[in-house]
Regions:
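Short, solvent-exposed loop/turn segments at conserved positions within beta-propeller repeat blades
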Residues: 20-21, 64-69, 128-130
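Surface-exposed loop and turn segments in beta-propeller and other repeat-based domains
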Residues: 79-106
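Short, conserved, GDST-rich strand-edge loop motifs in beta-rich repeat architectures
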Residues: 58-73, 134-135
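Short loop/turn segments that connect beta-strands within beta-propeller blades
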Residues: 29-33, 77-79, 138-141
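Short coil/turn segments at the loop-to-beta-strand junctions that recur within blades
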Residues: 34, 40-45, 89-93
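Beta-rich, blade/repeat-based domains predominating
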Residues: 1-14, 22, 41-55, 60-63, ...
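Blade-level signature of beta-propeller repeat domains, shared across WD40, Kelch, NHL, RCC1
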Residues: 107-143
């Protein structure tokens, strides 16, 4: 595990655990019973961050474990479907299953964690990124 969060978006609290090498989040009851997995093919995810109706996470590696200078941010909706990957490929579902997602461009290096402020801006910290400062992704207004 490389991160954990309590997810109460459904009205019932569960525990979300990042399973980085399995490219997924695993969901457990508060008593430790395994419930399900959220598959994120190609995304070696870090700590899940629950904010309002979404889950946000840094992706430390993309495509292949330990791939140098890769990574992006992934955002899942209230149905646990990937809806956006800043710095990564557009999510595509086929027969209800997420196709592999990967870094697109070279904005990020090993996104290791994210946090959000009250306005919904995302702050991304990077690991092993030659001393790079955190990056702020500003939320655009919905119109």
């Amino acid at each position: 595990a490389h991160g954990i969060a309590i997810d109460g978006r459904s009205g019932v609290e569960t525990v979300l655990v990042s399973s980085r090498e399995n490219t997924c989040f695993k969901r457990y009851s508060l008593t430790g019973e395994y419930l399900s997995s959220i598959e994120l093919h190609g995304a070696y995810v870090c700590r899940p961050v629950v904010h309002e109706e979404n889950i946000y996470a840094g992706v430390c590696w993309s495509g292949k474990l330990f791939r140098p200078n890769s990574g992006f941010v992934t955002i899942l909706d209230k149905s646990d479907r990937v809806v956006s990957n800043p710095g990564g490929s557009e999510p595509f579902y086929e027969n209800g299953k997420l196709k592999s997602i990967r870094q697109h461009g070279s904005l990020f290096k090993h996104c290791h964690d994210v946090c959000l402020d009250a306005a919904g801006n995302i702050y991304v910290c990077q690991w092993n990124a030659q001393g790079a400062y955190p990056i702020k992704l500003e939320r655009l207004s919905e119109s």
